[in-house]
A protein has these predicted regions:
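Glycine-rich phosphate/adenylate-binding loop
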Residues: 2, 102-109, 114-122, 126-128, ...
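Conserved N-terminal Rossmann-fold NAD(P)-binding element of oxidoreductases
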Residues: 28-30, 53
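Conserved S-adenosyl-L-methionine
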Residues: 44-49, 129
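Conserved SAM/SAH-binding loop
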Residues: 91-99
Length: 218
């Protein structure tokens, strides 16, 4: 077998699994400390088509946790697209209004790595739950061993997840999907962040997405 950048992914999932990854269309909402790491892992794993949506540019304060943030002033989604040809960048603010007008049906997996609650609720209601994965709060924490994956209704401790569940119920949502969250109590009031946690959130999202694509039990 000829070695290439995806040789070890082929070894892991076999040619059939790798073919599914190459054919997959994934949407990642958010290119910050969580979403950026998720996208990087997906691209390195051979996902053939990734649409990445985020409005922001890289700021110096991103450099404690966000990959490729050395390019201060660069548009986040475009910086990722320069590195990975499989990425289609969309520099857009994700709002409930944007979600209402966007076609999610063409994607095999949709990943929510944004912070805005209203937009998160709109996403959850717009996407087929079997294709949806979401991140809860990764800031204010330092212990990656406290990160968990569970059904959205089974989260605990995380204040963002608590509010998210409340707003989901209020919106009339009754579906079920997996989320990544932490059972570590927040250790500060400002949005302090540590790459050891935010990166692990993103990698957990990528793992869930890859398993959905290749058909492994999640």
């Amino acid at each position: 077998m000829q070695n290439d950048r995806f040789t070890r992914i082929r070894w892991l999932f076999g040619e059939d699994g790798f073919s599914k990854l190459q054919s997959a269309k994934v949407l990642v909402c958010g290119a910050g400390g969580v979403g950026g790491m998720c996208v990087d892992a997906l691209a390195r794993s051979g996902v053939g088509s990734i649409t990445l949506i985020d409005k922001d540019i890289f700021d110096v304060t991103n450099q404690n946790r966000q990959i490729y943030s050395e390019n201060v002033g660069g548009i986040k989604v475009e910086e990722f697209a320069k590195i990975y040809p499989c990425i289609t960048p969309m520099q857009t603010l994700i709002t409930p209004e944007f979600v209402a007008g966007f076609d999610f049906s063409k994607f095999d997996v949709v990943i929510d790595a944004i912070d805005d609650i209203a937009a998160k609720i709109a996403l959850a209601n717009a996407v087929d739950p079997s294709k949806f994965i979401a991140s809860m709060g990764g800031a204010k924490r330092v212990d990656p061993t406290k990160i968990k994956v569970a059904c959205v209704w089974k989260t605990s401790v995380d204040p963002l997840a608590r509010k998210y569940r409340y707003e989901l119920k209020r919106s009339g949502f009754s579906g079920n999907f997996d989320v990544v969250f932490s059972v570590e109590e927040p250790i500060c009031k400002p949005l302090g962040s540590f790459m050891g946690v935010t990166a692990c959130f993103g990698l957990n999202l990528a793992s869930l997405a890859v398993k959905k694509i290749v058909g492994q039990q999640v």
